[in-house]
């Protein structure tokens, strides 16, 4: 997903979509996938509103609907939620281009209300670490 898409989604997200993304983020540590009912309970929303928000988030590719396991939060959804939170707190006013993509994090330009340039770093916890791959390969030899 491009930075332009993510910036647009930060502006376009409805309150209910943000509540659902926040529920995903809260429950992410304990659950890989979530069903509609658990999201509704955690977000304190009516199930019909949750279904509507999930449909919209899935169309934007911020979550993934598995045919059998329920809904999964993807990196783009977590990134958009983080940018929304930073913008809501007044930390950033806008985002720019991608500065770099590393093995464990992505970094992008941002600007605050005073025009100061900032860098926003997204850690990719699930990304394969080269060090761990090398260690495992050495153990097999």
Language-model features: locations:
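Short alpha-helical segments that sit at the start of domains
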Residues: 1-21, 49
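Short, cationic-aromatic polyanion-contact patches
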Residues: 10-17, 67-86
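Short amphipathic alpha-helical interface segments
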Residues: 13-42
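Alpha-helical DNA-recognition elements
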Residues: 56
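Conserved ATP-binding subdomain of kinase catalytic cores across diverse folds
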Residues: 4-8, 48-51, 60, 64, ...
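Generic anion/oxyanion-binding catalytic loop in active/binding sites
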Residues: 9, 28, 39, 66, ...
């Amino acid at each position: 997903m491009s930075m332009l898409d993510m910036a647009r989604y930060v502006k376009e997200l409805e309150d209910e979509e943000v509540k659902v993304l926040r529920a995903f983020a809260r429950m992410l540590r304990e659950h890989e996938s979530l069903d509609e009912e658990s999201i509704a309970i955690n977000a304190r929303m009516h199930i019909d509103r949750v279904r509507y928000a999930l449909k919209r988030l899935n169309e934007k590719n911020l979550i993934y609907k598995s045919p059998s396991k329920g809904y999964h939060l993807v990196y783009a959804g977590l990134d958009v939620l983080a940018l929304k939170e930073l913008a809501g707190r007044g930390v950033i006013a806008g985002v720019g281009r991608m500065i770099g993509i590393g093995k464990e994090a992505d970094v992008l330009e941002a600007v605050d209300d005073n025009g100061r340039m900032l860098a926003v770093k997204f850690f990719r916890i699930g990304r394969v670490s080269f060090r761990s791959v090398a260690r495992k390969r050495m153990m097999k030899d």
